[in-house]
A protein has these predicted regions:
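Residue-level recognition of tetratricopeptide repeat
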Residues: 81, 146, 194, 242-244, ...
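Bacterial N-terminal signal peptides
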Residues: 15-23
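N-terminal secretory signal peptides that target proteins for export/translocation
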Residues: 1-9
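Alpha-helical junction/boundary sensor with strong preference for TPR arrays
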Residues: 75, 99, 132, 139, ...
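Boundary at the C-terminal end of the N-terminal hydrophobic targeting segment
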Residues: 28-32
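Short coil/linker segments at helix-helix boundaries
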Residues: 36-40, 44, 48-70, 88-193, ...
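Generic helix N-cap/helix-start motif at coil->alpha-helix transitions
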Residues: 41-44, 209, 242-247, 301-311, ...
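Terminal, low-structured helical/coil segments at or just beyond the last alpha-helical repeat
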Residues: 350, 357, 361-426
Length: 426
């Protein structure tokens, strides 16, 4: 199940600015020491999982895959004690989680995935689930041990639900999702300190309410649990859970999704889901996300996080800040090219097409030919027409698996282009 060599290729920087030379030498030594520590497997599973998720923001996967593989092999051969099973379960789940982050980096959708990532993701999710069930059959477990087992059982079922949904197995996805919700609740009831459960519950409850359709009707009685879901994820961030890197990304996306949700159009300004309030929170979260993870010293082989810039680009574009939006989209494109060329990552071509469409959209919205500039107006109308054709033909500015979200975004951008077209009398 080794996938790391297929995903990441280490490459030293060709040149360094003289001003930073001394500090880079020190950092290089510290990084080497850290990698050696990882290889020796000195980190407990929960600590390793937390550090690995943070490193995933910088596309640093390889040392963690190696560590997880080594620890899983060692623990599989060890006596089947409760403590060993807890560690093994956590490493299985952490491995699946890192593969999930690889799939996000490559921009997997139901139409684009690599078996070299998707199959191990399913495998390690199943192994985490199996190990959790073995644990729960043990006699004499403490409430804390039971809570941990239910936490990872629910988390693994959530992963399996996501995988099965992508494979088109809706029934299995619904069943595993329902089980995940119940088991995460059990984890919190047994031990409220299992704060990671908040992230899983938030994803499940918001996601089912916002995107679920039939599954929301079956699993949640059709109830609108969007706000409850958002609050769970807020709690995961407030309590500084290990899942905070994922919680930030998810919560920002969900807040963007609420701004374009037509169900919110007639809400009172005092309603927590009022679009302007969701916009304000999205901007706050983007600033916090940047300050917490992307404002430190320059990192080797890292030029930026494409998810952060993609969210920033969309928010700026929704706000009508098209110059900023274009700049952020261009940064996403730069990062995609870097990941493809320098790290040999197979980025979904549709993501790149969507980003290019975003850049074109911003360019069009920035056009401002004078009333007497007939050539400029004709040129603008031609470009606007091409972009309208792109959107009408199924093109997307965001490669998102939810048809509902794609449709809502298309409507917003299509409407803006139509208004610009009318302004120029195209």
């Amino acid at each position: 199940m080794k996938v790391s060599g297929q995903i990441i290729r280490k490459k030293m920087l060709a040149s360094m600015l003289l001003f930073f030379l001394a500090s880079l030498v020190v950092n290089s030594h510290a990084e080497s020491s850290r990698i050696e520590t990882l290889k020796k497997g000195h980190l407990p599973a929960q600590v390793a999982a937390r550090k690995a998720l943070e490193d995933s923001l910088y596309y640093r996967f390889e040392p963690w895959f190696e560590l997880f593989e080594n620890r899983i092999q060692s623990l599989t051969k060890a006596p089947e004690t409760v403590e060993n099973l807890l560690e093994l379960m956590t490493f299985h789940f952490a491995y699946a989680g890192m593969l999930g982050e690889v799939s996000h980096t490559l921009a997997f959708t139901s139409r684009y995935k690599l078996d070299s990532v998707a199959q191990p993701f399913s495998y390690y999710s199943q192994k985490a689930k199996e190990t959790a069930k073995i644990l729960l059959e043990k006699d004499g477990l403490t409430d804390l041990q039971k809570a941990k087992a239910y936490l990872y059982l629910g988390g693994a079922e959530g992963y399996i639900s996501i995988f099965d949904y992508g494979q088109g197995d809706l029934l299995s996805a619904i069943v595993n999702g329902f089980q995940a919700d119940g088991h995460l609740e059990q984890a919190l009831q047994l031990n409220p300190d299992q704060i990671e459960a908040h992230f899983g519950l938030g994803m499940y409850r918001y996601g089912n309410s916002r995107f679920g359709g039939v599954s929301n009707f079956l699993m949640q009685g059709g109830r609108d649990l969007r706000l409850k879901g958002l609050n769970h994820i807020e709690e995961a961030i407030r309590l500084n859970s290990s899942s905070s890197p994922l919680a930030y990304k998810t919560l920002i996306w969900f807040n963007i999704a609420e701004q374009i949700n037509p169900d919110n159009a007639d809400l009172e300004s005092s309603d927590p889901l009022f679009p302007a309030r969701r916009r304000e929170r999205a901007i706050e979260l983007l600033a916090q996300f940047k300050a917490r993870y992307f404002s430190g010293p320059i990192r080797k082989d890292f030029i930026g996080n494409k998810e952060f810039y993609m969210m920033s680009a969309l928010q700026a574009t929704l706000d009508g800040r098209y110059g900023e939006g274009k700049k952020e989209f261009e940064k996403v494109l730069e990062i995609c090219e870097f990941l493809k060329n320098e790290k040999q990552m197979a980025i979904n071509p549709q993501l790149i097409s969507s980003v290019q469409a975003g850049i074109k959209f911003c360019d069009l919205m920035l056009l401002d030919p004078s009333v007497n500039d007939e050539i400029g107006i004709r040129s603008a109308c031609l470009k606007i027409g091409e972009q309208l054709d792109f959107l009408e033909g199924g093109g997307a500015m965001l490669e998102y698996d939810s048809r509902k979200i794609r449709h809502e975004l298309q409507n917003i951008f299509f409407k803006a282009l139509k208004e610009t077209s009318a302004k120029f009398n195209c």
